[in-house]
Amino acid sequence: MPKLKLIGVDLGGTTFSVGLVSEDGKILKKVTRDTLVENGKEDVIRRIAETILEVSDGEEAPYVGIGSPGSIDRENGIVRFSPNFPDWHNVPLTDELAKRTGKKVFLENDANAFVLGEKWFGAGRGHDHIVALTLGTGIGGGVVTHGYLLTGRDGIGAELGHVVVEPNGPMCNCGTRGCLEAVASATAIRRFLREGYKKYHSSLVYKLAGSPEKADAKHLFDAARQGDRFALMIRDRVVDALARAVAGYIHIFNPEIVIIGGGISRAGEILFGPLREKVVDYIMPSFVGTYEVVASPLVEDAGILGAASIIKERIGG
C-alpha cells in the first residue's frame, strides 16, 4: 500500500503555492501561481482546485490543508474576511475546494499553520510548548501549549504581532500605536530607512541599496555586519522591540522554544545574538535558561509545510 501523502496550500494575496508533501515533511512537488485576486473569488478558488488536482495526480493524497491569511472559522472551513482578499466575506473555502477536488479539506489561519509546521516538521519537533513568530511584511505567530494549538475563544487568539512594544511608537495598520509589527516587520524597517535618509544619507545601507527607496532589511543587516552606525541603530531598535515581545511571551506561555521565521530571520547572528542577550534583560530570573530562541529551519517552505501539518494535526498525525 503506498504511503499517504499530504497536500499543503499556502494562500497569499500575491501568489499561492500547492505542494505534495511526504508524511515526514519532504516536499515532493510544488507549483506556485499568481493569485490574481482582482479576478474575483470564484476564479481564485477554481485555480487553486485545479492546481491541487495537478499536484496530486496519480498520488494517494486524499487530504488538503490550507493556510489562509485573515480571520477564519477553522471548524467550519470559512474565511470570514481577509485584507488580502477584499471580496471574500464568509467564504466556505473548504466546502468549495472539496466539491471541486473530491478531497477532505482543512483550513487554518496562516500564522497558526506556521507554528504547526514547526511543531511537526521544524525546530519545534519534540516540544510541547512552542511560540513561533514570523517576521515578514507583517508579523504573525502562533502558540502551542501542552502539544495543542492555542486559538482562544473565537479562534483568533495569539495575535503576537500586535502586542504594544513602543506605546508612543509608529502607527500600526491595525489602528494601534507601537505594535511589534509597526517596529520590527520588514515594512517597518523599510519605513525607518526611508525616513532616515535625510540625516544619515552617507550610511552604507544606501550605498548597498542604490537608493533610499530600494533599501530594505537585507541591506540593513549587511551594513550592520560591517559596523555601520545607522544600521546598528535601527538593528538595535528592532532587537529591543522583539526582545520586549518575546519576554512577554515567555512570561505568559512558558515555552520550551521560541522560533522566529520569515525573511528577517535569515539575518542570522547579527539579529539573534543581541536578541538572545536582550531577552534576558526583560525576563524574570526564574525564566532564564528555561527556553531557546532559534531561527526557523523551514525558510521558503514554511507555508506549504505549515499547511500540510494542519492535516496531521486534524487527523492525528
Curated annotation (Swiss-Prot):
Pfam family, one: ROK
N-terminal signal peptide: none
Group of enzyme by EC: transferase
Names of the cofactor(s): a divalent metal cation
The keyword Cell wall biogenesis/degradation appears for this protein: no
EC number from the UniProt entry: 2.7.1.2
An annotated GO BP: glycolytic process
Free-text cofactor note: Mg(2+) is the most effective ion. It can be efficiently replaced with Mn(2+) or Co(2+) and to some extent with Ni(2+).
Keywords from the UniProt entry: ATP-binding, Carbohydrate metabolism, Glucose metabolism, Kinase, Magnesium, Nucleotide-binding, Transferase
SUPFAM superfamilies, A to Z: Actin-like ATPase domain
Catalysed reaction, written as an equation: D-glucose + ATP = D-glucose 6-phosphate + ADP + H(+)
pH-dependence of activity, as noted: Optimum pH is 7.3.
Similarity-based family: Belongs to the ROK (NagC/XylR) family.
NCBIfam families from the UniProt entry: ROK_glcA_fam
Protein's name according to its UniProt entry: Glucokinase
Gene: glk
